[in-house]
A protein has these predicted regions:
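Non-transmembrane, aqueous-exposed alpha-helical and coiled segments at domain scale
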Residues: 1-233
């Protein structure tokens, strides 16, 4: 795009220098601390799709680069690495706390996902989300206040519309808020998430490399039944 990438500064800390390079500005101490906390909170989280992809590739004997490329490919999906920006876009669409419940009803009626809410593992509040919420509230401002109010309204609406499946704010909901507060451009939300998770990918690949067995999950056929033989007379 004709933009010049800023070179890294080895004299700076990791979070400080990363924030300087992605924002183009000299970061403030509170922004550095917020991004540092975000990077630590999201660096690893079990066998997510990208981590499992990395380990599967590593189990074939492929090198680290191949495993990380596969992880990035899985991470590019909007339901995984692209979720923080979409969650913040949803917050933009809602606009105010009194719009939250009607907005949720519209999404559910249309069969669309409510980005920033629900998790395949957690059936309660995501502990990472609670920590990021605390970071956002400590920073304060209209965006943090709106996020907290919208979270309460959306969770109440989802409890009404989906009583058999409790859905709570996940890590992506407040991740976007924290990154926005710290001055990270929205186009860099997913790369920032990727920078954090790369630490976990590397650790998982190194661990997988110690096991010489290839990962080959068992599949269960769910298609139409086999044709019945017709007797020949």
């Amino acid at each position: 795009r004709g933009e010049v990438a800023l070179p890294p500064d080895p004299a700076r800390g990791h979070a400080e220098d990363y924030l300087r390079m992605v924002s183009g500005d000299e970061p403030e101490a509170r922004d550095i601390r917020a991004i540092e906390q975000y990077l630590v909170l999201t660096l690893d989280h079990g066998f997510s799709a990208s981590t499992f992809a990395a380990r599967t590739i590593a189990s074939t004997g492929a090198d680290m680069v191949a495993a990380l490329v596969g992880a990035v490919g899985a991470f590019s999906g909007p339901l995984h690495g692209g979720a923080p920006s979409r969650a913040l876009e949803a917050l933009d669409q809602i606009g105010s706390a009194d719009r939250a419940r009607p907005w949720v009803r519209e999404q559910v009626a249309a069969g669309r996902r409510v980005m920033g809410f629900g998790h395949p593992v957690y059936r309660t509040h995501d502990p990472r989300s609670e920590l990021l919420k605390a970071i956002a509230r400590d920073r304060g401002g209209d965006l943090a206040d709106l996020a907290v109010q919208v979270e309460q309204e959306v969770e109440a609406a989802l409890a009404e519309l989906k009583p058999d499946r409790p859905l709570y704010a996940n890590v992506e909901f407040y991740a976007g808020v924290v990154m926005e507060q710290a001055g990270v451009p929205r186009s860099m939300f997913t790369p920032t998430f990727c920078v954090a998770r790369a630490v976990g990918w590397v650790a998982n690949v190194l661990e997988q490399a110690r096991d010489p067995k290839i990962i080959r999950p068992t599949a269960r056929y769910v298609g139409p039944p086999a044709p019945r033989p017709v007797p020949v007379r």
